[in-house]
Amino acid sequence: MNQYLAVTSNGMENLLAEELTKLGIENAKPVQAGVKFKATNEQIYRCCLWSRLASRFVRVLSEFTCNDDMDLYLSTSSINWVNQFHSSKRFVVDFNGTNREIRNSQYGAMKVKDGIVDCFEKKGLPRPNISKERPDIRVHVRLHKDKAILGVDMVGSGLHQRGYRPESGRAPLRETLAAAIVMRCGWDGSQPLLDPMCGSGTLLIEAAMMAANMAPGVKRKQWGFEALEDFEPELWAEIKSEANVQARRGVKKVDAKFFGFDNDPNVLKVAQDNARRAGVEELITFAQGDAATITRPAGFEAGVIVSNPPYGERLGTEPGLIALYTAFGGQLKAEFGGCKASIFSSSDELLSCLRMRADKQFKLNNGALPCHQKNYSIAERSADEVKGADTNVQIAPDFSNRLKKNIGKIGKWARKEKLDCYRIYDADLPEYNVAIDVYGDQIVIQEYAAPKNIPEEKAKRRLTDIIRATIQVTGVEANKVVLKVREKQKGLSQYQKLGQVSETLEVNEYGVKLIVNLHDYLDTGLFLDHKITRRRLGEMAQGKDFLNLFAYTGSATVHAAVGGARSTTTVDMSNTYLNWAKDNMQLNGCVGRQHRFEQADCLQWLENAKGEYDLIFIDPPTFSNSKRMETSFDVQRDHIKLMTNLKRLLRAGGAIVFSNNKRHFKMDEAGLAELGLKAQNISSQTLPLDFSRNKQIHNCWLVTHAE
């Protein structure tokens, strides 16, 4: 007998040990990410062919203490490699792990390779060649701290490669993980099994192969052990022949029914092709269908629903997933009473949206991603009971009630003012720390980063409740909800893209058309707290030369131009935002040489600017130390210097509208007086109703020449 290590994923060790025991292995011992055992050639051949859970099997040749590269080389070269494979065979070393002395896996692989070829040379034999592309032999090394395991791989390519799935649908599961999910889903092999989001069909195909008692490796063409010196081809041919006969007979004996649904017809075609290649196409019925509206198919009595719904890691995908899980949970309760369900997901928050209590739950990894599998018993209930349960449950009642109240008050005001964009919630309740903005028929939820003393799981659960409640209260479609996380900005982070959606939306603000982008940047292109400021600038701009500094997307410039400004000059450091400003102007028919755009550091531009303006709007950052700016800027410290440069450009009778977001900003009125300027605080006049709870969102000043 030889010593072996069956390699698997974390969380599957005990399940694999049970499987190996059923395959005739005695004393299978689970270890981290694997199972150790002893086996004869016949036993290991059967394990390789029949294991649904192992990713590979390794014949362990040595376990040793490895403090440095010399330990590694000496232990490797002491093995009689001639007994393992012929010098004509090509090999490769798969080296996993590092320690204090062996810090690079490639270096570790090289030392093992040296030990192997030196063993052959010492026996007067040719050096075997290395082949990374098509090796006959794979040497497996696992190093953790000072412990090393060295052996030869019995499999070749990973055992998850069953041979039936050359291509996959979205986010495919490995076949070994799919088999584990099926084994733990509560299905006994005879009940009907349904996957409402089947993708490329892996869960159903693995289950059908189990029901048919079909060896998962029956379609594989090549095995690592076939290149070993002790390979027994006649024994292997006999074992493989038995499995082939069993596969053909087993399919005909299956009574269980399998149903697969997906809303993507192209992915369904892939699933059907995979089932055909696996030899189980006659057992599975595939059809197009939406999990949110799925109904019980004919013949599905006391069955099991098993599924791996999407669980996007990008935050921006969450609202749609929350709506999907919520609707899916409702449909399970409405249509599948008396059945069982098993759902696999990386997100416990999404699973909570099912609103079902789990009977059992398991932890498994999907690659490096920790996941949960939860099993549910679905109670028999009447349609009226289900409908009442779903419609009467209010999500996050305090938050929902506040949101309803705000929508009633602010929505009425926005319609009267002819505004497409407005805020309906602004962290009104401390425990629900988000801002919610309406942009036409879409909603943006901005989550303020939770304090460090709030557990991450609690913050995630609360955000899930916010999204679900917002969808429930507003009736907005989930695909029209955008989620962002606001954190303290540094340097040029406000200019950096968050994604590549590149969808823009045209909105209306007091008769002015503006372009917003809800997806690609942290900000949308429109600061909603300044809507009244922009309207006022438009009212003041008739026949005047207008200057907009730190202009962002130029929305204030558009208001001034539409209001009848004689000329406009728009200055911003970002070329992206200047182009956006040009698009905003063109959208409103404001084109011509009288409208100038300058890409520049506004502070440097002011130092050298010439010309005179009747109306200047400036909304600088509170603080900036951007690499693209030569010096730092602090609005409290530097606002008098700023006004000194602005006064030089301000015509007699002209006005500066100066705004910033610094809380507790204090205008240096004495410094202004020395410049011959005076300031009037107009902050309250520029605060719109939707920001009335946050009176420090901005401060705004009207600066003019002193009389």
From Swiss-Prot:
Transmembrane segments: none annotated. Its EC number is 2.1.1.173, 2.1.1.264. Its main location: cytoplasm. InterPro entries: 23SrRNA_methyltr_KL, DNA_methylase_N6_adenine_CS, RlmKL-like_Mtase, RlmKL-like_Mtase_CS, RlmL_1st, SAM-dep_methyl-trfase, SAM-dependent_MTases_sf, THUMP_dom. It is found in: Cytoplasm. Coiled coil: none annotated. It catalyses: guanosine(2445) in 23S rRNA + S-adenosyl-L-methionine = N(2)-methylguanosine(2445) in 23S rRNA + S-adenosyl-L-homocysteine + H(+); guanosine(2069) in 23S rRNA + S-adenosyl-L-methionine = N(2)-methylguanosine(2069) in 23S rRNA + S-adenosyl-L-homocysteine + H(+). Residues 43-154 form the THUMP domain. The keyword S-adenosyl-L-methionine applies. One of its GO terms (molecular function) is rRNA (guanine-N7-)-methyltransferase activity. Pfam families: Methyltrans_SAM (PF10672), RlmL_1st (PF22020), THUMP (PF02926), UPF0020 (PF01170). Keywords: Cytoplasm, Methyltransferase, RNA-binding, rRNA processing, S-adenosyl-L-methionine, Transferase. SMART domains: THUMP (SM00981). It is an enzyme of class 2 (transferase). The keyword Lipid metabolism does not apply. It comes from the Bacteria. One of its GO terms (cellular component) is cytoplasm. Belongs to the methyltransferase superfamily. RlmKL family. Specifically methylates the guanine in position 2445 (m2G2445) and the guanine in position 2069 (m7G2069) of 23S rRNA. This is Ribosomal RNA large subunit methyltransferase K/L. The gene is rlmL.
